[in-house]
Structure formats: C-alpha cells, structure tokens
Amino acid sequence: QQWAVGHFM
C-alpha cells in the first residue's frame, strides 16, 4: 500500500 505513505504521512 504505497498510498498509505502519503495518506498517513
């Protein structure tokens, strides 16, 4: 889940 990197960060 690379989207999580920009979503939580």
From Swiss-Prot:
Task: According to the UniProt record, list the residues that bear Methionine amide.
Answer: M9
Where does the UniProt annotation locate this protein? Secreted
Q: Which GO terms describe its biological process?
A: defense response; neuropeptide signaling pathway
> What InterPro entries does the database record attribute to this sequence?
Bombesin
Asked whether the keyword Metal-binding is assigned, the reply is no
One GO cellular-component annotation of the UniProt record comes to: extracellular region
Locate the Pyrrolidone carboxylic acid modifications and list their residues: Q1
Which keywords describe this protein according to UniProt?
Amidation, Amphibian defense peptide, Pyrrolidone carboxylic acid, Secreted
Q: Provide the tissue specificity.
A: Expressed by the skin glands.
The family line of this record is: Belongs to the bombesin/neuromedin-B/ranatensin family.
Q: State the name under which the record lists this protein.
A: Litorin
Q: Taxonomically, what lineage is the organism?
A: Eukaryota, Metazoa, Chordata, Craniata, Vertebrata
